[in-house]
Amino acid sequence: MKNFFLTVFWILIPLLFFAQNADIDLLREINLNRNKALDPFLRGITHTAGPVAFVVPLLLLVVASIKKNRKLKRKAVIMVISVLTAVIVTTTLKYTINRPRPFETYSFIEKVTSGGSPSFPSGHTTDAFVLATALSLAFPRRHIIWPAFLWATAIAYSRMSLGVHYPADVLVGILIGTGAALLWHIIFSSRQESRA
C-alpha cells in the first residue's frame, strides 16, 4: 500500500506542476493580450454575479408567495437551495485549498479589479453558472437559456481577463455551479415522480 501511494505521489507531482504551468500560460495569454477597451464592461459585469445569483431566486420566491403559485415557488426553492449549496462548496474549497490569487504570485499579471478571498475556485463564476443552469432547468426556453449562459460565460471570462483567477479556478467554478443546480433539479424531480 505504501508503494502505491508513493507511485501516485510521484506521478501526481509532475502532473500538478504541468497543470500549474498550463494554467498560468493560458492566463497570461488572456490577461496580457486582452482588449483593454473592454475592461470597464468586464469590471461592471463581473460584479453582477453575486447580487444577481441571490436576488433572482429570492425575487421569484416572493412573487410565487404573493401569487400563491406553488409551481413557481417550487422552482424558486430549487434555485435558492442550488445557490446556497454552490456557495457553501465554493467557500469551503477556497479556505481549505487557500490558493493565492494569480496577481499575488505572478507580478506580470495585471490586476484590473478586486479579488479578496483565496483564488480556487472562482466564486463569481460559480454564482453565475449555478443561476444560469438553475434558471435554464426551471424555464427551459431559448430566450432564458441563451442570455443566462452568455451572462455567465462573460463573467467567467472576465475573472481571467481582469487578472483575478486562473483558468482552473474558473473551470471548477463552472463545474460546481452547474453541478449544484443539476443535483437539486434531479433530487426534486425524482421526489415529484415518486409522489405521482
Annotate the PLM regions.
Residues F18, L61-K71, L137-P140, L183-S189:
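Structural signal for the C-terminal ends of transmembrane alpha-helices
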Residues L60-V89:
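Interfacial segments of alpha-helical transmembrane regions
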Residues I66-N69, Y95-F103, V164-A168, S189-S194:
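Transmembrane helix-loop junctions in multipass membrane proteins, especially transporters and channels
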Residues K2-P57, T90-S117:
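N-terminal transmembrane-helix/juxtamembrane module of multi-pass inner/ER membrane proteins
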Residues V8-I11, M79, V83-V87, I174, ...:
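Alpha-helical transmembrane spans of integral membrane proteins, capturing the lipid-embedded, hydrophobic core
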Residues T85, V89, L93, I97, ...:
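Alpha-helical membrane-inserting segments
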Residues F5-L6, K73-S82, I144-P147, A168-V172:
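Alpha-helical transmembrane segments of integral membrane proteins
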Residues F108-A196:
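Membrane-embedded catalytic cores of phosphoryl/pyrophosphoryl-handling enzymes
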